[in-house]
């Protein structure tokens, strides 16, 4: 029998080109895709409930006879059908209806309908029920299984998806959908047969535990989640092997430049910086590409570690590229590296999207001629950027860069043959759960020591009814010679509205604090204008900076000791932690005021409570993952990572240790099963194996 992964959806009855196109929109191209497109939830239509026994809020199947159908005129015209079954009367209400529909619901018609029961003006009602007429004497049986509700898209009805899954299930068997988990592994980890799991999840029996299914703890769900997580783990192991099989430039440990750099620095690196620096120096001296993630909490001194790595490559005669996700952050790196490297006679080149014309041409020429240190934004990934001898790529805040961009960078190595070493830095600590799954292809170093002189930030929650007091607090801090940030957060995912809110707040604060010099920075300003404002704030010419979350990452103004964050309940914990990290960079006591808008939801209260209790980024990251889930944390929208079909990282975290062991066993004893698994679960993700 043909494998269902090879059979297109057009082989199903009723699927022509137009429907195939709609199915492709939700990633359904083969019969295997249809079978792995699992229901989100289930409805119980296996029993008929008497009208007299109905309760508001319940979903129910009801049978009865139409006692009348009238058009009701009110604020909205609706068709009201009265249904009786001997135990009571129920109204069916339709706001969208045709004359033909009204004619089909005439008095005496026998109906079976399904929907949510609600209280109405004249007793219980169901709005827009699904219904069918029961004609003739032959009874039509109720559903034999729970009814699946599938993820869908415009133009794809539940009815249609159920018909298609029914046809695909009829073709399902061990030969049409091979089980690539060896029997021994399945036995060791108590995993049931694949085809039985899929059959169960599409059509659970009437006595299935709906709650267990809703929580994702049923054996059939765990069987599929295990296989999906296992495949993801295998893809990362493959990725690692692929990278290791390539040659990279060998960069011997340097001494001359790092010594001079540290002497000029004016402070001693922390023990953690020295330890991580040594791990990186060892990796760079090998002839296989380094893939190392350096995690450090806000202010842990990752940039110094990156500079030491860069000097090792430069002393060996190679080029280094440092990329940051925003122009503000890239510019900050450029200024830092210029300050550190120019005294060592090392040229630092700059390339960002805003460079145009002659300046851009000159920058490209310098890079092509071998400028040792190149700093920029994602503009460095573009085809026209040609490096002479790129040996090390430093990527700041990696999960803001997409997989494609990491690929593009790989191809810019020495002569297109040697693969550059990659050092990835993030100030968003990655929870262990995610590190075990999403970043299993990277070696990890942790900077767990803050440099001396950093002060902890005192965080307080204040309701926005006390806004005037908060404004006075800003005045007092600025009078003492300190500086402050006032952050306006995202409004309904609209950058435009957020920028307008920032402008309004800027006008309000400029008027209330007339004697202070107030600046404004938001995402819609031109990069050059943003840079001017940031520079003025850094130099102390502005005392208060009103900003949107564009200042979240990497901005360093040691004299700023007060931050006000408006509507903090709209942000995730990791983002709040990043914002708070902009203060507490000097020796003065620093404060962060979370100016919230009551009433707070339960999650909002928990989230802000965590911010008040801890400043440990790793604790915050674990909590953020619990409250938000992995996709948001990793910025999956651009990484293509971790968009699982069945698995859920938080829910299935306890499977991960077993999944890792199973991946090792499979690679060691059944390597021939790896490719079919990758093809099944990551069919469109094969290019990620190149990253």
Regions found by a protein language model. Give the residues of each.
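Structural detector for short beta-strands of small beta-barrel domains
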Residues: 56-77, 115
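Inter-lobe coupling/hinge segments of SF2-like helicase ATPases
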Residues: 275-278, 289-610, 624, 665, ...
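Short boundary/loop segments of OB/S1/cold-shock single-stranded nucleic-acid-binding domains
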Residues: 40-60
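N-terminal pre-Walker A segment at the start of P-loop NTPase domains
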Residues: 267-277
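Upstream accessory/linker segments immediately N-terminal to the RecA-like ATPase cores of bacterial MutS
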Residues: 72-264, 636, 669
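Long, highly charged, low-complexity intrinsically disordered interaction regions
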Residues: 1-12, 21-24, 231-232, 242
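C-terminal accessory region of SF2 helicases/translocases
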Residues: 599-691
